[in-house]
A protein has these predicted regions:
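Residue-level preference for non-acidic, small/hydrophobic
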Residues: 37, 91, 158-161, 186
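Glycine-rich acyl-CoA binding loop
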Residues: 150-158
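Conserved GNAT acetyl-CoA-binding A-motif
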Residues: 165-177
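A short, structure-level motif marking secondary-structure boundaries and short turns
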Residues: 17-20, 146-147, 168
Length: 226
């Protein structure tokens, strides 16, 4: 993998404190094992990879409630990119419910190309963008309209995706980064592991404390234009 440090869009402070910030990107080379990159904490994004406090689950240890399996029978799914209209409709409802602002995935056609669409009574109610490798499944972004919250589509989606991943021979299910209190729930799922920067940890308490700390940090907008 070729590693790039972006010092143009990065910034630093050296007069009264030592601070250097630069985005770090990785570009896989022809012979790189993509599952090995995931194993070492890298996550894919468009044509580059990045390091993150990523979260994954050992598929051999995941257990699902009977209620989730029962509700899953009410949902039909199909592979393929949802229409722009459906993406906008579902993403808006999902963001309003969660209080999220960022739309970087929902506006990314490349990410949406590989999606699983979820239908209830013939209506598209949710979708997940994903990537599939030889031994790894990555759930990049999930969204649903919350019109029937009793369905708990998030649990059903995770059940279906885990089942498909196992059938494809995957060992791990990756769910991108674990930051802020909105990601606390990720530590409550069987088979949970998170990337510390040097190893995969099963320490739930430390992970939860870090997520809570994230939510206390305030970041002011930094204008890096020259």
């Amino acid at each position: 993998m070729k590693i790039i440090f972006d010092h143009i869009n990065g910034f630093g402070k050296i007069s009264n404190q030592d601070l250097i910030y630069a985005d770090v990107f990785g570009y896989p080379e022809i012979n790189d094992d993509l599952d090995e990159l995931l194993e070492n904490g890298w996550l894919p994004w468009n044509n580059y990879w990045f390091q993150s406090r990523s979260v994954r689950y050992d598929l051999s240890k995941i257990q699902f409630h009977k209620k989730t399996k029962k509700n899953a029978k009410k949902i039909e799914y199909q592979l393929g990119k949802p229409s722009n209209e459906d993406v906008d409709r579902i993403a808006k409802a999902y963001q309003n419910k969660k209080g999220f602002i960022s739309k970087h995935v929902f506006d990314n056609d490349l990410m949406l190309e590989n999606s699983i669409q979820y239908f209830y009574e013939s209506k598209l109610i949710g979708f997940v963008c994903y990537k599939l490798f030889k031994k790894s499944f990555i759930g990049i972004q999930f969204a649903w309209d919350y019109e029937k919250p009793q369905l708990s589509l998030g649990n059903i989606s995770f059940f279906i995706e885990s089942t498909l991943a196992k059938r494809s021979g995957c060992i791990y299910y990756y769910v991108m980064g674990g930051y802020e209190e909105c990601c606390l729930y990720k530590s409550e799922i069987d088979g949970f592991e998170w990337w510390t920067g040097k190893e995969w940890s099963k320490d739930k308490e430390l992970y939860q404390n870090l997520c809570k700390r994230d939510s206390l940090i305030e970041i002011k907008n930094v204008n890096c234009d020259i």
